[in-house]
Amino acid sequence: MALISLAIDYKKSPIEVRSEFALSGLDVSMLYRSILAIDNVVHAVILSTCNRTEVYLEISDLRVVDDILVWWQGYVRNPNYKIKDYFKLRQGTEVIMHLMKLACGLESMVLGEPQILGQVKDSYTLSKKNHAIGKELDRVFQKVFATAKRVRSETRIGYCPVSVAFSAITLAKRQLDNISSKNVLIIGAGQTGELLFRHVTALAPKQIMLANRTIEKAQKITSVFRNASAHYLSELPQLIKKADIIIAAVNVLEYIVTCKYVGDKPRVFIDISIPQALDPKLGELEQNVYYCVDDINAVIEDNKDKRKYESSKAQKIIVKSLEEYLEKEKAIISNSAIKELFQKADGLVDLSLEKSLAKIRNGKDAEEIIKRFAYEIKKKVLHYPVVGMKEASKQGRSDCLVCMKRMFGLNVEK
Protein backbone atom coordinates (compact mmCIF):
# COMPACT_ATOMS: atom_id res chain seq x y z
CA MET A 1 0.00 0.00 0.00
CA ALA A 2 1.34 3.46 -0.91
CA LEU A 3 0.54 6.86 0.61
CA ILE A 4 0.20 9.83 -1.77
CA SER A 5 -1.37 13.27 -1.91
CA LEU A 6 -2.47 15.48 -4.79
CA ALA A 7 -2.71 19.20 -4.11
CA ILE A 8 -3.58 22.53 -5.64
CA ASP A 9 -2.68 25.48 -3.42
CA TYR A 10 -2.01 29.21 -3.33
CA LYS A 11 1.76 28.78 -3.85
CA LYS A 12 1.35 27.63 -7.44
CA SER A 13 -2.23 28.57 -8.34
CA PRO A 14 -3.93 32.01 -8.27
CA ILE A 15 -7.42 32.37 -6.87
CA GLU A 16 -9.28 31.83 -10.15
CA VAL A 17 -7.52 28.47 -10.58
CA ARG A 18 -8.16 27.42 -6.97
CA SER A 19 -11.80 28.34 -7.42
CA GLU A 20 -12.13 26.03 -10.40
CA PHE A 21 -10.56 23.05 -8.65
CA ALA A 22 -12.18 23.57 -5.23
CA LEU A 23 -14.23 20.61 -3.99
CA SER A 24 -15.94 22.55 -1.21
CA GLY A 25 -19.66 23.10 -1.59
CA LEU A 26 -20.13 19.71 -3.27
CA ASP A 27 -21.91 16.70 -1.78
CA VAL A 28 -19.26 15.15 0.48
CA SER A 29 -20.75 11.65 0.49
CA MET A 30 -20.92 11.70 -3.30
CA LEU A 31 -17.27 12.81 -3.51
CA TYR A 32 -16.10 9.94 -1.31
CA ARG A 33 -18.25 7.36 -3.10
CA SER A 34 -16.90 8.43 -6.47
CA ILE A 35 -13.21 8.55 -5.51
CA LEU A 36 -13.33 5.20 -3.68
CA ALA A 37 -14.96 3.68 -6.77
CA ILE A 38 -11.70 4.23 -8.69
CA ASP A 39 -9.71 1.00 -9.02
CA ASN A 40 -6.63 0.89 -6.75
CA VAL A 41 -7.88 3.74 -4.53
CA VAL A 42 -8.24 2.16 -1.10
CA HIS A 43 -8.77 5.07 1.33
CA ALA A 44 -9.06 8.86 1.05
CA VAL A 45 -9.29 12.14 2.95
CA ILE A 46 -10.38 15.26 1.05
CA LEU A 47 -9.39 18.74 2.29
CA SER A 48 -10.74 21.89 0.62
CA THR A 49 -10.16 25.39 2.05
CA CYS A 50 -9.84 28.91 0.67
CA ASN A 51 -6.12 28.42 -0.03
CA ARG A 52 -5.89 24.77 -1.07
CA THR A 53 -7.63 21.61 -2.15
CA GLU A 54 -5.76 18.42 -1.31
CA VAL A 55 -6.59 14.73 -1.53
CA TYR A 56 -4.73 12.25 0.70
CA LEU A 57 -4.86 8.65 -0.47
CA GLU A 58 -3.85 5.10 0.25
CA ILE A 59 -3.44 3.37 -3.11
CA SER A 60 -2.39 -0.07 -4.29
CA ASP A 61 -0.84 1.07 -7.60
CA LEU A 62 0.85 4.41 -8.36
CA ARG A 63 -0.50 4.33 -11.91
CA VAL A 64 -3.90 5.26 -10.48
CA VAL A 65 -2.77 8.92 -10.26
CA ASP A 66 -3.94 9.53 -13.84
CA ASP A 67 -7.40 8.16 -12.99
CA ILE A 68 -7.61 10.43 -9.93
CA LEU A 69 -6.75 13.46 -12.07
CA VAL A 70 -9.52 12.51 -14.50
CA TRP A 71 -11.91 12.21 -11.53
CA TRP A 72 -10.91 15.67 -10.24
CA GLN A 73 -11.08 17.25 -13.70
CA GLY A 74 -14.69 16.08 -13.88
CA TYR A 75 -15.68 18.64 -11.23
CA VAL A 76 -14.14 21.60 -13.07
CA ARG A 77 -16.69 23.94 -14.63
CA ASN A 78 -14.32 25.63 -17.09
CA PRO A 79 -12.69 23.07 -19.43
CA ASN A 80 -9.87 25.51 -20.23
CA TYR A 81 -8.35 24.77 -16.83
CA LYS A 82 -6.37 21.51 -16.90
CA ILE A 83 -5.46 19.99 -13.56
CA LYS A 84 -2.20 18.55 -14.91
CA ASP A 85 -0.91 22.12 -15.25
CA TYR A 86 -1.33 22.94 -11.57
CA PHE A 87 -1.33 19.92 -9.26
CA LYS A 88 1.52 18.73 -7.02
CA LEU A 89 2.06 15.05 -6.24
CA ARG A 90 3.65 13.95 -2.97
CA GLN A 91 4.55 10.40 -1.95
CA GLY A 92 5.40 8.49 1.23
CA THR A 93 7.10 10.41 4.04
CA GLU A 94 6.84 13.63 2.02
CA VAL A 95 3.05 13.41 2.45
CA ILE A 96 3.32 13.02 6.22
CA MET A 97 5.87 15.84 6.58
CA HIS A 98 3.68 18.16 4.49
CA LEU A 99 0.54 17.29 6.45
CA MET A 100 2.30 17.92 9.77
CA LYS A 101 3.57 21.31 8.56
CA LEU A 102 0.13 22.11 7.16
CA ALA A 103 -1.71 21.31 10.41
CA CYS A 104 0.82 23.41 12.36
CA GLY A 105 0.21 26.40 10.08
CA LEU A 106 3.66 26.37 8.46
CA GLU A 107 2.24 25.87 4.95
CA SER A 108 -0.45 28.52 5.35
CA MET A 109 -0.59 31.88 3.61
CA VAL A 110 -0.69 33.25 7.15
CA LEU A 111 2.29 31.62 8.89
CA GLY A 112 1.12 29.80 12.01
CA GLU A 113 -2.60 30.51 11.56
CA PRO A 114 -4.66 28.17 13.77
CA GLN A 115 -7.78 27.72 11.61
CA ILE A 116 -6.16 25.17 9.30
CA LEU A 117 -5.88 22.61 12.12
CA GLY A 118 -9.63 22.75 12.63
CA GLN A 119 -10.16 22.37 8.89
CA VAL A 120 -7.86 19.33 8.75
CA LYS A 121 -9.72 17.80 11.70
CA ASP A 122 -13.07 18.42 9.99
CA SER A 123 -11.82 16.72 6.81
CA TYR A 124 -10.61 13.73 8.84
CA THR A 125 -13.98 13.48 10.61
CA LEU A 126 -15.89 13.59 7.32
CA SER A 127 -13.66 10.85 5.91
CA LYS A 128 -14.37 8.65 8.93
CA LYS A 129 -18.08 9.40 8.68
CA ASN A 130 -18.00 8.21 5.06
CA HIS A 131 -15.97 5.08 5.93
CA ALA A 132 -13.14 6.31 3.69
CA ILE A 133 -10.19 6.16 6.08
CA GLY A 134 -8.08 3.09 6.84
CA LYS A 135 -5.76 2.12 9.69
CA GLU A 136 -2.56 3.56 8.19
CA LEU A 137 -4.10 6.88 7.15
CA ASP A 138 -5.81 7.08 10.54
CA ARG A 139 -2.47 6.64 12.33
CA VAL A 140 -0.97 9.39 10.15
CA PHE A 141 -3.69 11.88 11.06
CA GLN A 142 -3.58 11.01 14.77
CA LYS A 143 0.17 11.69 14.79
CA VAL A 144 -0.39 14.92 12.85
CA PHE A 145 -2.91 16.15 15.44
CA ALA A 146 -0.58 15.24 18.31
CA THR A 147 2.27 17.09 16.58
CA ALA A 148 0.17 20.21 16.01
CA LYS A 149 -0.88 20.21 19.67
CA ARG A 150 2.75 19.96 20.75
CA VAL A 151 3.81 22.79 18.42
CA ARG A 152 1.05 25.04 19.79
CA SER A 153 2.03 24.34 23.39
CA GLU A 154 5.84 24.50 22.98
CA THR A 155 6.15 27.45 20.58
CA ARG A 156 4.49 30.84 20.08
CA ILE A 157 3.85 30.22 16.39
CA GLY A 158 0.22 31.31 16.80
CA TYR A 159 0.86 34.12 19.26
CA CYS A 160 0.19 37.05 16.91
CA PRO A 161 -3.56 37.34 16.20
CA VAL A 162 -3.09 36.85 12.48
CA SER A 163 -5.39 34.82 10.27
CA VAL A 164 -7.03 35.30 6.90
CA ALA A 165 -10.04 36.61 8.82
CA PHE A 166 -7.94 39.02 10.90
CA SER A 167 -6.08 40.19 7.80
CA ALA A 168 -9.41 40.83 6.05
CA ILE A 169 -10.51 43.08 8.91
CA THR A 170 -7.14 44.86 8.78
CA LEU A 171 -7.77 45.69 5.11
CA ALA A 172 -11.22 47.02 5.95
CA LYS A 173 -9.76 49.27 8.67
CA ARG A 174 -7.24 50.68 6.19
CA GLN A 175 -10.07 51.80 3.90
CA LEU A 176 -12.43 53.08 6.59
CA ASP A 177 -10.92 54.99 9.50
CA ASN A 178 -14.00 54.97 11.72
CA ILE A 179 -15.66 51.55 11.59
CA SER A 180 -17.74 52.40 14.67
CA SER A 181 -20.05 54.40 12.41
CA LYS A 182 -20.29 51.71 9.71
CA ASN A 183 -22.60 48.77 9.02
CA VAL A 184 -20.84 45.46 8.38
CA LEU A 185 -22.32 42.51 6.49
CA ILE A 186 -20.67 39.11 6.93
CA ILE A 187 -21.79 36.37 4.54
CA GLY A 188 -21.27 32.87 5.93
CA ALA A 189 -21.46 31.55 9.50
CA GLY A 190 -18.88 28.77 9.25
CA GLN A 191 -15.62 28.66 11.18
CA THR A 192 -14.08 31.58 9.26
CA GLY A 193 -17.35 33.55 9.33
CA GLU A 194 -17.56 33.17 13.10
CA LEU A 195 -13.94 34.29 13.43
CA LEU A 196 -14.69 37.32 11.25
CA PHE A 197 -17.65 38.13 13.49
CA ARG A 198 -15.44 38.07 16.60
CA HIS A 199 -12.84 40.38 15.03
CA VAL A 200 -15.54 42.80 13.82
CA THR A 201 -17.30 42.97 17.20
CA ALA A 202 -13.98 44.02 18.76
CA LEU A 203 -14.15 47.15 16.56
CA ALA A 204 -17.68 48.00 17.83
CA PRO A 205 -19.32 48.85 14.48
CA LYS A 206 -22.72 50.52 14.29
CA GLN A 207 -24.33 47.24 13.18
CA ILE A 208 -23.25 43.72 12.18
CA MET A 209 -25.44 41.65 9.88
CA LEU A 210 -24.63 37.94 9.55
CA ALA A 211 -26.23 36.09 6.63
CA ASN A 212 -26.18 32.31 6.33
CA ARG A 213 -28.04 29.46 4.63
CA THR A 214 -29.37 28.25 7.98
CA ILE A 215 -30.42 31.11 10.22
CA GLU A 216 -30.10 29.06 13.43
CA LYS A 217 -26.31 29.02 13.21
CA ALA A 218 -26.20 32.75 12.49
CA GLN A 219 -28.55 33.44 15.42
CA LYS A 220 -26.34 31.48 17.80
CA ILE A 221 -23.30 33.56 16.80
CA THR A 222 -25.03 36.97 16.81
CA SER A 223 -26.78 36.44 20.15
CA VAL A 224 -23.67 37.57 22.04
CA PHE A 225 -23.62 41.09 20.50
CA ARG A 226 -26.52 43.51 20.93
CA ASN A 227 -25.98 45.35 17.64
CA ALA A 228 -25.91 42.14 15.58
CA SER A 229 -28.65 40.46 13.59
CA ALA A 230 -29.00 37.10 11.81
CA HIS A 231 -30.40 36.75 8.30
CA TYR A 232 -31.02 34.27 5.48
CA LEU A 233 -28.89 34.48 2.32
CA SER A 234 -32.08 35.30 0.42
CA GLU A 235 -32.09 38.69 2.18
CA LEU A 236 -28.77 39.75 0.61
CA PRO A 237 -30.19 42.38 -1.81
CA GLN A 238 -31.72 44.32 1.11
CA LEU A 239 -28.73 43.79 3.42
CA ILE A 240 -26.21 45.05 0.85
CA LYS A 241 -28.09 48.35 0.56
CA LYS A 242 -27.49 48.94 4.29
CA ALA A 243 -23.89 47.72 4.41
CA ASP A 244 -20.68 49.75 4.15
CA ILE A 245 -18.41 46.70 4.41
CA ILE A 246 -19.29 43.32 2.91
CA ILE A 247 -17.10 40.32 3.77
CA ALA A 248 -17.84 36.89 2.29
CA ALA A 249 -16.62 33.56 3.68
CA VAL A 250 -19.08 31.07 2.26
CA ASN A 251 -19.09 27.92 0.10
CA VAL A 252 -20.94 28.63 -3.16
CA LEU A 253 -20.53 27.53 -6.75
CA GLU A 254 -21.32 30.91 -8.34
CA TYR A 255 -21.28 34.61 -7.46
CA ILE A 256 -24.01 35.52 -4.97
CA VAL A 257 -23.24 39.27 -5.04
CA THR A 258 -22.87 41.01 -8.41
CA CYS A 259 -22.90 44.59 -9.69
CA LYS A 260 -26.69 44.59 -10.06
CA TYR A 261 -27.02 44.62 -6.26
CA VAL A 262 -25.06 47.84 -5.70
CA GLY A 263 -25.76 51.49 -6.42
CA ASP A 264 -23.55 54.56 -6.08
CA LYS A 265 -22.83 54.14 -2.38
CA PRO A 266 -19.11 53.54 -1.66
CA ARG A 267 -18.48 50.10 -0.21
CA VAL A 268 -15.60 47.82 0.71
CA PHE A 269 -15.97 44.26 -0.60
CA ILE A 270 -13.70 41.55 0.80
CA ASP A 271 -14.06 38.02 -0.54
CA ILE A 272 -12.18 35.23 1.23
CA SER A 273 -14.37 32.51 -0.27
CA ILE A 274 -13.12 29.75 -2.55
CA PRO A 275 -14.78 29.54 -5.05
CA GLN A 276 -15.32 33.30 -5.05
CA ALA A 277 -18.71 34.52 -3.84
CA LEU A 278 -18.37 38.21 -4.76
CA ASP A 279 -18.04 39.13 -8.42
CA PRO A 280 -14.56 40.69 -8.99
CA LYS A 281 -16.25 43.20 -11.34
CA LEU A 282 -17.51 44.94 -8.19
CA GLY A 283 -13.99 46.34 -7.90
CA GLU A 284 -14.24 47.91 -11.35
CA LEU A 285 -16.92 50.32 -10.12
CA GLU A 286 -15.21 53.58 -9.18
CA GLN A 287 -16.91 53.96 -5.80
CA ASN A 288 -16.01 50.46 -4.58
CA VAL A 289 -12.92 48.82 -3.12
CA TYR A 290 -12.59 45.07 -3.75
CA TYR A 291 -10.20 42.56 -2.19
CA CYS A 292 -9.90 38.80 -2.69
CA VAL A 293 -7.87 36.19 -0.79
CA ASP A 294 -4.70 36.89 -2.77
CA ASP A 295 -4.83 40.60 -1.86
CA ILE A 296 -4.49 39.65 1.80
CA ASN A 297 -0.88 38.60 1.15
CA ALA A 298 0.46 42.10 1.80
CA VAL A 299 -1.09 42.20 5.27
CA ILE A 300 0.19 38.74 6.00
CA GLU A 301 3.78 39.55 4.97
CA ASP A 302 3.92 42.21 7.70
CA ASN A 303 3.45 39.53 10.32
CA LYS A 304 5.70 36.80 8.96
CA ASP A 305 8.93 38.07 10.48
CA LYS A 306 7.38 37.89 13.95
CA ARG A 307 6.78 34.19 13.51
CA LYS A 308 9.86 33.01 11.61
CA TYR A 309 11.85 32.24 14.74
CA GLU A 310 8.96 30.23 16.20
CA SER A 311 8.62 28.52 12.83
CA SER A 312 12.16 27.12 13.07
CA LYS A 313 11.35 25.71 16.52
CA ALA A 314 8.19 24.16 15.12
CA GLN A 315 10.16 22.59 12.26
CA LYS A 316 12.43 20.80 14.73
CA ILE A 317 9.42 19.40 16.59
CA ILE A 318 7.91 18.21 13.30
CA VAL A 319 11.13 16.47 12.20
CA LYS A 320 11.35 14.70 15.57
CA SER A 321 7.68 13.76 15.40
CA LEU A 322 8.08 12.33 11.90
CA GLU A 323 11.03 10.24 13.06
CA GLU A 324 8.94 8.90 15.95
CA TYR A 325 6.11 8.04 13.60
CA LEU A 326 8.37 6.21 11.14
CA GLU A 327 10.02 4.22 13.94
CA LYS A 328 6.62 3.19 15.25
CA GLU A 329 5.50 2.20 11.74
CA LYS A 330 8.60 0.03 11.35
CA ALA A 331 7.71 -1.71 14.62
CA ILE A 332 4.12 -2.22 13.45
CA ILE A 333 5.31 -3.72 10.15
CA SER A 334 7.88 -5.99 11.82
CA ASN A 335 5.40 -7.09 14.51
CA SER A 336 2.87 -7.90 11.80
CA ALA A 337 5.48 -9.95 9.91
CA ILE A 338 6.52 -11.75 13.10
CA LYS A 339 2.90 -12.55 13.92
CA GLU A 340 2.37 -13.90 10.41
CA LEU A 341 5.57 -15.97 10.70
CA PHE A 342 4.40 -17.59 13.93
CA GLN A 343 0.97 -18.26 12.44
CA LYS A 344 2.65 -19.92 9.46
CA ALA A 345 4.80 -22.06 11.78
CA ASP A 346 1.80 -22.97 13.93
CA GLY A 347 -0.03 -24.12 10.83
CA LEU A 348 2.88 -26.33 9.74
CA VAL A 349 3.34 -27.82 13.23
CA ASP A 350 -0.36 -28.40 13.90
CA LEU A 351 -0.89 -30.32 10.66
CA SER A 352 2.18 -32.57 11.09
CA LEU A 353 1.61 -32.99 14.83
CA GLU A 354 -1.96 -34.21 14.38
CA LYS A 355 -0.84 -36.78 11.82
CA SER A 356 2.01 -37.97 14.09
CA LEU A 357 -0.20 -38.27 17.18
CA ALA A 358 -2.78 -40.23 15.20
CA LYS A 359 -0.08 -42.73 14.17
CA ILE A 360 1.14 -43.09 17.77
CA ARG A 361 -2.42 -43.67 18.98
CA ASN A 362 -2.71 -46.42 16.36
CA GLY A 363 0.27 -48.23 17.91
CA LYS A 364 3.07 -47.08 15.61
CA ASP A 365 6.62 -46.79 17.00
CA ALA A 366 6.58 -43.47 18.93
CA GLU A 367 10.34 -42.87 18.66
CA GLU A 368 10.30 -43.35 14.91
CA ILE A 369 7.21 -41.11 14.56
CA ILE A 370 8.83 -38.30 16.60
CA LYS A 371 12.02 -38.48 14.51
CA ARG A 372 9.94 -38.33 11.34
CA PHE A 373 7.90 -35.41 12.74
CA ALA A 374 11.08 -33.42 13.53
CA TYR A 375 12.47 -34.07 10.04
CA GLU A 376 9.23 -32.92 8.35
CA ILE A 377 9.04 -29.75 10.41
CA LYS A 378 12.70 -28.92 9.65
CA LYS A 379 12.08 -29.47 5.94
CA LYS A 380 8.91 -27.36 5.86
CA VAL A 381 10.29 -24.49 7.95
CA LEU A 382 13.49 -24.22 5.89
CA HIS A 383 11.84 -24.66 2.47
CA TYR A 384 11.16 -20.98 1.69
CA PRO A 385 14.44 -19.62 3.18
CA VAL A 386 16.43 -22.17 1.13
CA VAL A 387 14.51 -21.27 -2.05
CA GLY A 388 15.09 -17.57 -1.31
CA MET A 389 18.83 -18.04 -0.75
CA LYS A 390 19.20 -19.98 -4.00
CA GLU A 391 17.32 -17.27 -5.91
CA ALA A 392 19.41 -14.51 -4.31
CA SER A 393 22.58 -16.38 -5.24
CA LYS A 394 21.45 -16.71 -8.88
CA GLN A 395 20.79 -12.96 -9.04
CA GLY A 396 24.09 -12.07 -7.38
CA ARG A 397 22.29 -10.51 -4.42
CA SER A 398 24.98 -10.98 -1.79
CA ASP A 399 23.19 -8.44 0.42
CA CYS A 400 20.15 -10.74 0.62
CA LEU A 401 22.36 -13.72 1.43
CA VAL A 402 24.07 -11.82 4.26
CA CYS A 403 20.70 -10.70 5.61
CA MET A 404 19.32 -14.26 5.60
CA LYS A 405 22.48 -15.60 7.26
CA ARG A 406 22.05 -13.06 10.03
CA MET A 407 18.41 -14.03 10.43
CA PHE A 408 19.41 -17.64 11.08
CA GLY A 409 22.50 -16.85 13.17
CA LEU A 410 24.94 -18.14 10.53
CA ASN A 411 28.51 -16.99 9.93
CA VAL A 412 28.29 -14.03 7.54
CA GLU A 413 32.04 -14.15 6.79
CA LYS A 414 31.78 -17.44 4.88
Curated annotation (Swiss-Prot):
One of its GO terms (molecular function) is glutamyl-tRNA reductase activity. It comes from the Bacteria. Substrate binds at residues 49-52, 108, 113-115, 119. Its EC number is 1.2.1.70. Gene3D superfamilies: Glutamyl-tRNA reductase, N-terminal domain (3.30.460.30), NAD(P)-binding Rossmann-like Domain (3.40.50.720). Pathway: Porphyrin-containing compound metabolism; protoporphyrin-IX biosynthesis; 5-aminolevulinate from L-glutamyl-tRNA(Glu): step 1/2. Disulfide bonds: none annotated. It catalyses: (S)-4-amino-5-oxopentanoate + tRNA(Glu) + NADP(+) = L-glutamyl-tRNA(Glu) + NADPH + H(+). The keyword NADP applies. The record marks 98 as: Important for activity. Keywords: NADP, Oxidoreductase, Porphyrin biosynthesis. It is an enzyme of class 1 (oxidoreductase). NADP(+) binds at residues 188-193. Catalyzes the NADPH-dependent reduction of glutamyl-tRNA(Glu) to glutamate 1-semialdehyde (GSA). During catalysis, the active site Cys acts as a nucleophile attacking the alpha-carbonyl group of tRNA-bound glutamate with the formation of a thioester intermediate between enzyme and glutamate, and the concomitant release of tRNA(Glu). The thioester intermediate is finally reduced by direct hydride transfer from NADPH, to form the product GSA. This is Glutamyl-tRNA reductase.
